[in-house]
Amino acid sequence: MESRVLSSGATTISGIPRLTRPAGRTTTTTVVAVASPAKLNTNGGNLVWGRQLRPSLLNLDHSSPVSLVTKPVKRDVLKPCTATASDSAGDAAPVGFFAKYPFLVTGFFFFMWYFLNVIFNILNKKIYNYFPYPYFVSAIHLAVGVVYCLGGWAVGLPKRAPMDSNLLKLLIPVAFCHALGHVTSNVSFAAVAVSFTHTIKSLEPFFNAAASQFILGQSIPITLWLSLAPVVIGVSMASLTELSFNWLGFISAMISNISFTYRSIYSKKAMTDMDSTNLYAYISIISLLFCIPPAIILEGPQLLKHGFSDAIAKVGMTKFISDLFWVGMFYHLYNQLAINTLERVAPLTHAVGNVLKRVFVIGFSIIVFGNKISTQTAIGTSIAIAGVAVYSLIKAKIEEEKRGLKSA
């Protein structure tokens, strides 16, 4: 930087008159460096502040005889630019608390993700204990979320992103798979213990790997396949001795795994620049349209005949409506926080967090509902969760290595 300033002032130095002493004395030349204004650069790296120039280049030693320059020299000094970053900490703009401690924000996201997920699963199962209509409840989950999204758009939080016909065509398969996976998950939740459903749903990585290998034609490393072996073994052990086992709950959870696998496949084809909040809002709206018809056809007559009246007789109108509203809010918010958390952390961190979330849900559901599980079921569940953890870590590491190669 100093070399640039000196070179830009070369023409000015040549114009300064020489002061010569009488004969017999040595000649001293006054060297005055005058900095012309440097070209501003928005990256802040090429800015030269006035206080940086003065000590080294612009100060004249007034105790020296050469300070007797009769012609005044005008010195141009750069003023600090408030719009760009400063070279010193003293000129930096004030940093907010959350910007200064981002790990606290990320920790809060994880906490709320876990908390809302656990509360959703517990409240959801309590509703099914007195209102066993999973198709209707699934539609309520999405309906409450849609109302929440529409309210957010109405006040500009967030601002609604535009939707065109091309994006709509891409999102319809994603929303259909999301709706099918959501409904079948709830059918399983209503039929068997929450802990058992989540144990079956831990097989989802196996279906993802199989779909990637045989449908998308992607090569899956042998290490990933080996890491899935404990998952399959653990789920098999847990299923054989699960006290609440029935085929409806088991098959529904398996269909949910397949549905969410295809949702991932279609999501990759529907990659868009739309932010995750708006994208999830549109998926929720379309998914709700898919969930309403089966709820009316399969459960409508029973609901009108005795479903609603039985639920109100058991818990009362206020609690019944309140439970449906809050379970829908918890469902939407925990899914939204899961997406927002993924945006804040690396895939490896999110993978670990997702595994721990399933452990929390299984553990809390056993404690809250007092589900009795056999020793073999407990061991099988632990093996399955451990296998999912290993798979998630290996997959996340592979993804990070791929991104590192692309950025290089």
UniProtKB/Swiss-Prot annotation:
Residues 1-82 form a transit peptide. It is a multi-pass membrane protein. This is Triose phosphate/phosphate translocator, chloroplastic. Coiled coil: none annotated. It is found in: Plastid, Chloroplast membrane. It comes from Flaveria pringlei. Keywords: Chloroplast, Membrane, Plastid, Transit peptide, Transmembrane, Transmembrane helix, Transport. Mediates the export of fixed carbons from the chloroplasts into the cytosol in the form of triose phosphates. It holds the Pfam family TPT. Belongs to the TPT transporter family. TPT (TC 2.A.7.9) subfamily. The keyword Chloroplast applies. GO terms for molecular function: organophosphate ester transmembrane transporter activity; phosphoglycerate transmembrane transporter activity.
